[in-house]
Design a protein with these regions (language model features):
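Glycine-rich, acidic/polar active-site loops that bind/position phosphate-bearing ligands
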Residues: 1-172
Length: 172
């Protein structure tokens, strides 16, 4: 039913993937989705958000979002399979040496900055292996795009460090 759709790149969202320079430049960008006749695809989440923001503006409302995104870091076993063993046993706002995730979070934040995304802060959360990265307030579409990019960056940086990133609310 929806096999023929068109992607319309939003050039303002282009960003180099900093972890891919050894394979030539690779970028990510977001797109709008339409049917071949140009009508918007009803399940295009960016399109849905744009329409919601436009509807709110017509009603006199404007929004800014400042996300606090959390994730857990888990160890892998000798075969590279995910375990249920957290990377550390630190608690809220701990620092090294208890917070073994500190350098991974730093690498995540620096990678995001290279991509033009400005994290406001990062810290260890309450649970073992639980981390949080906070973002500055921005418009809804940028906040959503940044959240999607964040998921990819966290998974990639975790894997590069021999870890697994889990975004479940309570994986332990």
């Amino acid at each position: 039913v929806n096999s023929d759709l068109f992607l319309h790149p939003d050039a303002s969202t282009i960003a180099l993937l900093p972890w891919r320079p050894e394979h030539g430049s690779v970028v990510r960008m977001f797109c709008s989705i339409t049917h071949p006749d140009g009508t918007p695809f009803a399940h295009d989440t960016r399109g849905i958000l744009k329409q919601a923001v436009a509807d709110a503006a017509k009603a006199g409302y404007a929004f800014s979002f400042g996300s606090e995104l959390e994730f857990y870091l888990f160890r892998l076993d000798e075969n590279g399979e995910v375990t249920d063993v957290p990377y550390d046993q630190a608690t809220y706002m701990d620092v090294a040496p208890e917070d073994r995730c500190e350098n991974v979070r730093r690498e995540i934040c620096l990678t995001l900055e290279q991509m033009g995304i400005q994290p406001e802060s990062s810290h260890h959360e309450e649970g073992p292996g639980q981390n949080e990265v906070d973002f500055r307030y921005s418009d809804p579409l940028s906040a959503a795009d940044n959240a999607v990019t964040f998921l990819t960056v966290v998974k990639t940086i975790a894997a590069r460090n021999g870890l697994y990133a889990d975004f479940s609310p309570r994986p332990l």
